Regions:
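Conserved ATP-driven motor cores of ASCE-family P-loop NTPases powering translocation/secretion/packaging/pilus
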Residues: 48, 322-323, 329-415
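Short, solvent-exposed amphipathic alpha-helical segments in soluble enzyme
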Residues: 280-283, 360, 416-418
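Conserved beta-strand scaffold positions in the cores of enzyme catalytic domains, especially
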Residues: 6-10, 262-264, 362
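Glycine-rich phosphate-binding loop of nucleotide-binding enzymes
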Residues: 1-21, 32, 353, 401, ...
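Short, well-ordered loop/turn elements at secondary-structure boundaries
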Residues: 2-5, 257-260, 299-301, 336-338, ...
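Flexible glycine-/small-residue-rich
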Residues: 11, 266-269, 307-309, 401-405, ...
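Conserved P-loop NTPase motor module
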Residues: 127, 131-134, 140, 396-436
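P-loop NTPase motor domains
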Residues: 1, 14-326
Length: 436
């Protein structure tokens, strides 16, 4: 498998899987379903702080899964599901109102907050289903948010107490205990609604600055929901039951047939942060899949990850969006699970020391930059000044090979690829004076 960041290799690799489906070339589209991201990967993509915002986003994902579960059921015109949906939301709204009534002291503060909550809850219901019973229920709450000379005379409290007698608490708790586990499908279209519901709960608990604390994260969420760059995460040709199914269907990893032994992902049009997330998530899935193998299976059907322009993924001294760079982990531990890393870069001095320290073999093409030459000289054993001269003087197609794969350093002529990659240099002088 290769994470290729440009389209120059289309000719030799016609079975590539780019993330986009509108290239005009006979590609198969690449998808990375958002619901296969784990919590840490979501937090990294949203640039959320691990301590403060992790519990918030976990609640959002859990609420999204609940919304999807009960609303998906309601769409089937199942009266039982519809009752569960209405019962749960009434219970949830009453819980938020009760929090406000218990947290605040004056009737003016209580009623002002409750009126605002009712308005936002109405927006949530309208976004979900426009259920008439729930809309009427919220309207009745709003109608009891009146003040006479600054007093509500317990009108709202009496109404909520009365309504609680009509709520099936056990059924509501049953839905509340529905938990999202990694790999379960949920519809991303419920994310914004779930965010608003969790924000309302946090504000009702007295966390008045929760919207301020989550503003950056929610801006990134809007980017995911609306930007074409994330379309390959939102849209997919099929639902995948789990990571293993995804790897088998998308990359034929774990499949019995051997028809797709080399797969190229064209990631040339995604931004740096999305690129890092995309490659990290796919590599993490493959790592976890290989790690689950036991006995002889662990040594069968090995997987090689080829990283072209590797300085985009494994930069030296870089702040990765994910706390632990998966490629460094694969470099350290992948051998035990028959998962191997092939790193290609024109700037070796920019690569992670951790990854390079685990590399057993090196193929060095022509290098002119002194910084890169010194770096190669420092990391390679048995590397002498003579080899530096050979590297400087080498012509396209020549390379020096070092490492465990050869008994001694070798200078070789690489066989020319047929067909050639689409990477020939432009003849500038000829193009300048070309007659139209």
């Amino acid at each position: 498998m290769s994470d290729e960041v440009s389209t120059i290799f289309y000719k030799p690799f016609k079975d590539a899987k780019p993330y986009k489906d509108d290239t005009g070339i006979d590609y198969k589209p690449f998808y990375l379903p958002y619901y296969l991201l784990n919590l840490e990967e979501w937090l990294a993509f949203l640039m959320a702080s691990d301590r403060a915002q992790k519990p918030f986003w976990d609640k959002v994902l859990q609420m999204t899964y609940k919304f999807y579960s009960i609303f998906n059921c309601e769409q089937k015109n199942d009266k039982k599901c519809e009752f569960e949906f209405i019962n749960y939301f009434k219970w949830k709204i009453l819980g938020i109102i009760d929090l406000i009534l218990s947290q605040l002291e004056s009737d003016t503060a209580k009623i002002t907050a409750a009126r605002g909550i009712a308005g936002r809850c109405l927006n949530i219901i309208n976004a979900l289903s426009k259920n008439e019973e729930l809309i009427k229920f919220i309207s009745e709450i709003s109608s009891r948010c009146g003040l006479i000379y600054g007093n509500n005379n317990s009108e709202l409290q009496d109404f909520t107490n009365e309504q609680r007698t009509n709520i099936d608490e056990d059924l509501a708790w049953k839905i509340e205990e529905i938990k999202l586990t990694h790999g379960n499908y949920y519809d991303y279209k419920f994310l914004n609604t779930a965010v608003e519901m969790v924000l309302l709960e946090e504000e009702a608990r007295g966390n008045a600055r929760i919207r301020e604390f989550t503003s950056t994260m929610l801006t990134r969420l809007d980017f995911f929901l609306n930007n074409n760059e994330c379309r390959f995460m939102r849209e997919s040709e099929q639902k995948y039951d789990n990571t293993s199914t995804y790897l088998r269907e998308m990359f034929h990893i774990g499949a019995n047939e051997q028809n797709n032994q080399l797969i190229t992902i064209d990631s040339s049009e995604v931004g740096t942060d999305v690129l890092e997330l995309m490659t990290s998530v796919v590599s993490r899935m493959i790592y976890d899949y290989r790690k689950e193998k036991i006995g002889p299976d662990r040594r069968q059907q090995p997987v090689h990850l080829l990283l072209d322009e590797a300085h985009r993924y494994i930069r030296k001294d870089a702040q990765y969006i994910l706390r632990e760079n998966i490629f460094e982990k694969i470099a350290r531990e992948g051998r035990k699970y028959s998962l191997f890393l092939v790193v290609s870069s024109q700037r070796p001095s920019e690569l992670s020391d951790t990854v390079l320290s685990q590399c057993a073999n090196f193929i060095v093409h022509r290098i002119q930059n002194e910084v890169d030459l010194k770096y190669v000289y420092a990391i390679l054993p048995y590397f002498s000044e003579d080899f530096i001269t050979k590297i400087k003087q080498s012509v396209p197609g020549e390379a020096l090979i070092f490492g465990n794969c050869v008994p001694m350093p070798l200078q070789v002529q690489v066989i020319q690829a047929k067909p050639d990659p689409n990477s020939k240099n432009c003849n500038v002088e000829e193009e300048w004076f070309r007659q139209q």
